Each structure stands twice: as structure tokens, then as C-alpha cells.
A protein has these predicted regions:
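Structural signature of nuclease core domains in nucleic-acid processing machines
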Residues: 1-211
Length: 211
């Protein structure tokens, strides 16, 4: 169970562009490798559900415009007495920068945040010297569609595994600080141990944004 923290909309040419926003007190990142392997899907499920069901609610064609994790914490930065105001502002902005993906359409990005003298402050993108917006967070409508279809396949697979009663310990592993066992609530009952009784970690292949 769960609920959306915030949904932002922008209406343009009869279409409603929606982005899902989640407030985070920690340093949550949008990790495509985790997403592609079936973890951290919540924000995308919200977005694609809105795309599928939203037209009946809003009487508009719904276009998914992205998902963003928004820091919900005070920006505390290290500095010195000689630090300039501009440098201090850059450090603060970096702490408050959103994480996620956004639709790679100039009009949509401008509706989210107009570039100022310092460029784009809060979206997870950059403005290069030529004035073009760049960054791995930019995704085309085609790639969002691919991600939606893949998410649907993952849900179907999860449903089949649940129906089959598959409860085998099969923890993913990307390192000592990024693995399924790190915060697992069932560790006391599971007793998973690499190499014992057939216990094996599941190493995840890295997924690049351009894929």
C-alpha cells in the first residue's frame, strides 16, 4: 500500500503532462539498474497508472513527464568565511537538487523550471554553453514507453511467483552497502549465508541510461 506525495500537472495543446514527486529526507537516488531489475518501482507505478487511468479522471490525454525525488531536509553545507555568496548558493542548490527522470521535451522542461543566469538549479539536468539541456535524467517518450512495458512485465512475473508460492531467499547484491539483506526485516528467520546450503547472491547486471 502507499500513496503519492505529490502530482504536478501542466496542460498544453489539450494534453495534460504529469510528473510524480516524492519527498525524501535521505539521499534517495533514481537507480536505473535497480528499476530494471524490479526494485524501487513505486514512483513509476504511480506515473504509469496515472497515464493509463488519468484520462477518465481529467478528461485529457495524459502524457507522463517524469518522476522526481525531492529533498525534504535543510541544506547543510561545509564552507568557510571566505566563501562567496555565489559559491554558497551553488552548494546549497546541489544539496536541494532533485533526483529522477524527466521528459526530454524543451517546452515541458521550461514549464518545470525556466533556466536562469545560473542555469537550471533544481532539475537533475544541466545547460551547456550552447544553451542546450543535457543529462542522463532526460528520457524520450519512446524510452518512457519502453520502461512502462518492462514494468508491466515485472509485475506479471511477481504475480506468477507469488501464485506459485515461491519464497526462496534470492537476495540481490551490488555491494556491501547496496544489497537486499542490508535492511531486511526477515533476516532473523531467513539466516541467509552465501555458499551455505545452496545460498547464492543474485548479482545485478548494470543498466546504462542509453539502453
Amino acid at each position: 500500500s502507499g500513496f503519492v506525495d505529490r502530482v504536478d500537472g501542466w496542460e498544453h495543446d489539450g494534453r495534460l503532462y504529469l510528473r510524480v514527486v516524492d519527498y525524501k529526507t535521505g539521499r534517495k537516488t533514481f537507480d536505473l539498474t535497480d528499476i530494471w531489475n524490479g526494485m524501487g518501482l513505486q514512483m513509476l507505478l504511480y506515473l504509469f497508472t496515472l497515464e493509463r487511468e488519468g484520462e477518465a479522471l481529467y478528461n485529457r490525454e495524459i502524457i507522463p513527464a517524469g518522476v522526481l525525488y525531492l529533498p525534504a531536509r535543510d541544506a547543510v553545507v561545509a564552507g568557510s568565511r571566505t566563501m562567496s555568496e555565489a559559491e554558497r548558493r551553488r552548494k546549497v542548490d546541489a544539496e536541494l537538487r532533485r533526483r529522477g527522470i524527466v521528459l526530454d521535451e524543451p517546452e515541458v522542461l521550461a514549464a518545470m523550471e525556466e533556466p536562469g543566469e545560473a542555469g537550471i538549479r533544481f532539475l537533475p539536468v544541466k545547460v551547456n554553453k550552447a544553451g542546450a539541456i543535457t543529462g542522463e535524467a532526460l528520457v524520450s517518450a519512446e524510452r518512457l514507453g519502453k520502461l512502462a512495458r518492462h514494468t508491466g512485465r515485472i509485475l506479471e512475473e511477481i504475480g506468477r511467483e507469488l501464485a506459485a508460492g515461491n519464497i526462496a531467499a534470492d537476495p540481490f547484491w551490488r555491494g556491501p552497502d547496496h544489497n537486499a539483506c542490508q535492511w531486511c526485516e526477515y533476516a532473523a528467520a531467513c539466516h541467509f549465508e552465501e555458499g551455505r546450503g545452496g545460498d547464492r547472491r543474485r548479482f545485478l547486471p548494470a543498466v546504462r541510461s542509453e539502453e
